[in-house]
Amino acid sequence: MTELRQLLQRLSPNLRYALLGELQGLNGQAPSEVAKVSDADLLTALRSAIGDAGRQRRRVVVTGLGAVTPVGNTAVDTWDALVAGKSGIARVTQFDITPYASQMGGEVKNFDPSNRIPRKEARRMARCSQLAVIAAYDAAEDSGLDIESLDKTRVGVVMGTGLGGMDLYNNIIAESVRSGENRVKSRPLEAINGLPNMPAFHISQTFGARGPLNTIVTACAAGTQAIGTASEEIRRGSVDVMFAGGVEGLIVDVFYASFEAMRAVSTSNDDPAKASRPFDAKRDGFVIGEGAGVFVLESLEHAIGRGARIYAEVLGWGQSADAYHIAAPDPQATGAAAAMRAALADANISPDAIEYINAHAAGTPLGDAHETKAIKDVFGPRAYQIPISSTKSMVGHLFGGAGAVEAMACVRTVYTDTIHPTINLEYPDPECDLDYVPNVARKAEVNAALSNSFGLGGQNATLIVGKFRE
């Protein structure tokens, strides 16, 4: 094995990362170097690589983007607002926020689901399902797909969410207490509509998608993992088209009370637009937000066959677990770094290929420093040369929807060579000393972009997208 290991050390960076990708499939995460792998695992990975040599996985491209967010009710409006550095955070209006220490949120404005969803059906849905379906319409129209002409058995849906329709259950309980009657008995389907898998179901029902139907429930990592999972379905050939993304609709009192008790949310109520301050020395917690992001993903062959506009290619993704604490990040940042390395291995590229990072960056004192450390661990001295920005500085933390909206920002970045800023970054923090694109958007060529999502429960996910090249 000594001679073999010496040969492996002379592999090109891309070939070495291909081997690391095989090792990721074997062990669940990629090691940082081939030298750290046992002889047995190395031989297994090599056999797998040789066996798969004639079976190239299908390429996955992004052809449609949809969004409903605190800064825009379409993906186009959302992107324009992000580039302009517009905050969507204001005092909460959906319930009486007065008793709570954190009184602002990233609410979707002027949202009327009945513009696209029959009014009776919309009334039954949880807010997360309403947001998801409207974002899916936006994505479908943006893609130019002729839905009715598709083989619906080869169209699937994967959505991520943290808590699904908690707002529906919150309202059912509150109204039952007020009225003294069991509201569930009179409206049985309303309770079912609060289940976490309902956003995916409603998208499937709306478009008649009869392929794989899945829901990822991994808190703040859910949207990113949903896009990665959907990409895998296309890669292995089980479908041609996937709707994929994430959603959350949790501007509700129980959610505010919970995070207030954890002391996790910002209490800078005097100026809500400046409350979300990722990487800033005066950051004091995240701001709760709501919204949805949905992608239309296609196999490259399917997209080219119908003459689709292609925004970007999904190059790879990775995931890991901290196995440390239910809410706090691992101080060593090993899990976050492992997710990034796994995504690089899956994409078969070296760290030097990444030219932009959309950070998880929620604005918590521990979390932002933790992510900065992880980025330095993966990229070394070059970390200081990579532009990094936080979408959450403008929309707040969308939980299950965050990863999808932030991945959308990455896609638009590689498509337009424009990087949106991190707003409210005014006071440098010595622990957060990288290039966070403060306050003003930037033009720069970006061939590959990386998006991080780190969820409660220590769930880490990273997605990499790149410019499409035939």
Indicate residue ranges for each PLM-predicted region:
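Active-site-proximal alpha-helical scaffold in enzymes
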Residues: A132-L145, P196-E248, V287-A308, H397-I419, ...
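ACP-dependent fatty acid/polyketide chain-elongation machinery
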Residues: T2-E121, S143, E301-Y311, M408-T422, ...
